[in-house]
Amino acid sequence: MDNNIQRLIDSAKQSLNSPESYKYIDESFESCIKCTACTAVCPVSRNNPLYPGPKQSGPDGERLRLKSAELYDEALKYCTNCKRCEVACPSDVKIGDLIVRARNNHLAQSKKPLMNKLRDAILSNTDVMGKINTPLAPIVNTITGLKATKFMLEKTLNISKKRTLPKYAFGTFRSWYMKNALQDQQKFERKVAYFHGCYVNYNNPQLGKEFLKVFNAMNIGVMLLEKEKCCGLPLMVNGFPNRARNIAQFNTDYIGKMVDENGIDVISEASSCSLNLRDEYHHILGIDNAKVRPHIHMVTPFLYQLFKEGKTLPLKPLKLRVAYHTACHVDKAGWAPYTLEVLKKIPSLEIIMLPSQCCGIAGTYGFKSENYEISQSIGKNLFDNINEGGFDYVISECQTCKWQIDMSSNVTCIHPLTLLCMSMDA
């Protein structure tokens, strides 16, 4: 007993003597009232008996982890970071953040299998993979679509052979913008900055072009940050917090430079990127982004505000029946009502809001062999609702939700910006 007490005292002294510790202290777990509302809404708990749930892995586990660093748990890896636990929590405990930080600490202390570590590095370093693959996109896309390739990826890197891998674009959005759009954007008096992220840059430049089209139609020009990197979310949740922290500081610095020099807001069309840039950089990584945080926006709430200011779009009737899927991080941030109000501007459009539930992919989570079946089980009810609803499209702001829905249902998932452009072109 005396040894345990002395160990607690030594640990406390070490923390007090470390300035770095103050950045990451999160005492929200003390507010947990043990109501288990978080566990009731957790999509993983319902589908994976090995996961004890967010209450035990989060606030309950944090109390134990403060006593002994040896009490980190392998079950932490099952959390998808969907944050539905945080939405449900009546005490505003940052349950998902607690689990992500604990998981990163656990991975730092444990010996992850070499091939899994390589797999996680490949899935997490999106800029590196994008720069390698976009110049060779036609070849890469053909090779990664082969059954033999998928078989080898599962046997070597534990990437599920059942997962449809994302396709790369032949050329990046950023290079297209510099060659074809930069000069035209200078003519607009009012401007916004666009954080395009890795998905638009390497996988879907067309979505970035649609971003420009919508804002230009509102007489607003679009600038790019001088430099940007992937928001760092894949690194943050896969056990590379130091690398994620460096990227977060890099992006925060360049967002700050844009705000200081031009006094304009920075917009992202991606829900998880927006949440990460605005909230998680500080909550999880300890980055001081207080100066730039008010200037970081998700695109649909920003468009909603523009409509409130009197801005308009030349929208024409679309006689379509579409389903709106509330992505997990959209639910966490409370952005869904704004997206729905923006889409209601499209004449003749029928919008059905699907029950809010996780699609299961959770970024890189659903690509891993050990998670694939759980991922699909989590999303099954959603896929059934989509397939049985008679929809022309599913709408979502989340790119990985799009990958999951496109692969697992009979209906194509598109971004709200794409639907707005369809209406403008009708």
UniProtKB/Swiss-Prot annotation:
- Listed SUPFAM superfamilies: alpha-helical ferredoxin
Please name the Gene3D superfamilies in this protein's record. Alpha-helical ferredoxin
Q: Which InterPro entries match?
A: 4Fe4S_Fe-S-bd, 4Fe4S_Fe_S_CS, Cys_rich_dom, G3P_DH_GlpC_su, Helical_ferredxn
Binding sites annotated in the UniProt record for [4Fe-4S] cluster 1: 32, 35, 38, 89
Question: Residues in domain 4Fe-4S ferredoxin-type?
Answer: 21-53, 67-99
Where is this gene product found? Cell inner membrane
Q: How does it sit in the membrane?
A: Peripheral membrane protein
Alphabetized, the UniProt keywords read: 4Fe-4S, Cell inner membrane, Cell membrane, Electron transport, Iron, Iron-sulfur, Membrane, Metal-binding, Repeat, Transport
Principal place of residence: membrane
User: MF terms per GO, please?
Assistant: 4 iron, 4 sulfur cluster binding; glycerol-3-phosphate dehydrogenase (quinone) activity; metal ion binding
Any one GO CC term of the record: glycerol-3-phosphate dehydrogenase (FAD) complex
PROSITE patterns, per the entry: 4FE4S_FER_1, 4FE4S_FER_2
| Subunit relationships | Composed of a catalytic GlpA/B dimer and of GlpC.
Name of protein: Anaerobic glycerol-3-phosphate dehydrogenase subunit C
The encoding gene is: glpC
